[in-house]
Amino acid sequence: MTTSVPVPALDRDLIGRLRADVIASAWTVENLQNLLSQGAMSALMRDSRLPALVELAGSSDPAAVLTRFFILCQPERASALSEALPTLGAEGLEALGLAAIIDEAEAASALTASRACGAPKREPKDKDENVQEASAPKAPSLPTMRDPDEEAPEPEVAEDPWMRALFDLRPHAATLPDGDHEWWVASDLGEVQTGKPLADDHVLGIGGATLTLLEMTVRERVDSALDVGCGCGIQALYLATHAGRVVATDLSARACAITQFNAALNETTIDVREGSLFEPVEGEAFDLIVTNPPFVITPDSVRGAAGLLEYRDGGMERDNLIRAVLRGAPACMNEGGTLQMLANWEIPESRNPDTQWSWRVDSWLEGLPVDAWVVQRDVLDPARYVDMWIRDSGGQLMERADYERAFTSWLADFRRAGTGAIGMGFVALRRLDEAEAASGGERAYDLSLDGHAPRGRDVAWALASLRAPELWDTALTRASDVREERHYVPGSADPELIIMHQGGGLGRSVPVSSAVSAVVGASDGELTVGQIAAAVAMLTSVEVDDVRAEIEAPLRDLIRWGFLTY
């Protein structure tokens, strides 16, 4: 593992200058998309920086300079940075701890790729003073003797030195219920940018899992919100747009410092506290809790050899971190409050990963005063899981022997534990009031939601649907985007297969029976489900109780998924 650089300075004057400069430079997501082709933008999303380097090589546009420097991790002359950030300047960047001066040799090595892309060789401002002409070779000279009592002279610094970024800094745009937002978010540089393994206390930027949680978070106005395991603080920035008070916690002191920096840079008030899970907010309760906890199931043998990556490994045995979050959350939730989290869980070899995956999660939720919607969006066998997470932490930089040692040790741990698969998904909880809790919580488990990832309103609806009115006395309304597809054997009057499609919402496609199709088709908000079921029974010459038994569970699923509303 590598050693982390010091965290950015929380100097609000300098941070204010940086904010003014990035705004003035139009360093926004929209402008970045104008500077780069769709292909280069897509490559950046895959952590491939070379296409963007090719397209931005040699450009003096301030947004291009800042993109090369902070996102593509290319050295820049201090003068170029001062032109891009005229209020802060290169000296201010260095004072904030966002950049450092490097020597010509380090700069030349890092710039090899960009020069191969066609970028002109950028010289110091005064060539004659800083560059020895090739036609005038320097004569050898005798070393100068210095008095031992004399202080050593300060090392010479070039008038226009090269600088390199110490952090990733990039624009991030969001359209939320309260309007459009443009933020700038700092995080630690990744191994793709540095070519080095991650430090133990690495603070991750905005990755795919982060975006998933951001998309699925309920964005209703609340008085208070909590981000557990805040990392770079992006979840907390989003929460601040619709919560009167936001608290962000993290076990990592480094993550807390970077969250504080990002809050200051984006002029947002966030109460940042260091500590494990809910310990920093003991005795407090919130209307909304979000968490992308360090859930990767990591054995002690791997931690001992490679270190504990704080951003993904909470240090607990097996998947007990998820259990700790679920069991501890209700005490920190107001009645009616919501928890949303991403999670991994182990599935024993003795259980089917498609039909019995929820057993472990269900045991954790047993007896809690909550309703729960749990979705397993993917399932991996242990070998694929191990390979994915080793590569995530820079496995491509490992020596073959080190990679194989870590892989076999990790896989052997899963075998000893009897783990047959690892489920990956999300959990949404709603805290019950005293009367609801007396009768116990409702829980729904869904496997591999196809279509779209759920958005906040989809999650809110799914949780609310667990407390839907008595089905048979309820008049349901079919969503306007629901369509039906029927498959027939040639010459047959009855369909062999009926598939119901959802255009919006979760975008699901669900096989249904003829009876379910008939009920959905007749659900226009006028007749109750009981009345429609009786009509279907009469038309098909089937007992009404048999029709009810056939349609009850599928209708509850269709309600939860948004095909039907009440």
Residue map of PLM features:
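Acidic, low-complexity/disordered tracts enriched in E/D and polar residues
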Residues: T2-V65, E159-A165, R170, Q193, ...
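Long, charge-rich, low-complexity alpha-helical segments
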Residues: P62-S114, P153-D168, L214, G231, ...
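Class I S-adenosylmethionine
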Residues: H181-T217, P495-L497, S509-S514
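Conserved SAM/SAH cofactor-binding pocket of Class I
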Residues: A199, G207-T291, T298
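Conserved Class I SAM-dependent methyltransferase catalytic core
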Residues: L251-S252, E317-Q376
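Mobile active-site "lid"/loop adjacent to the S-adenosyl-L-methionine
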Residues: A253, P293-A324
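Flexible, glycine-/basic-rich loop-and-beta segments that form/coincide
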Residues: P382-L466
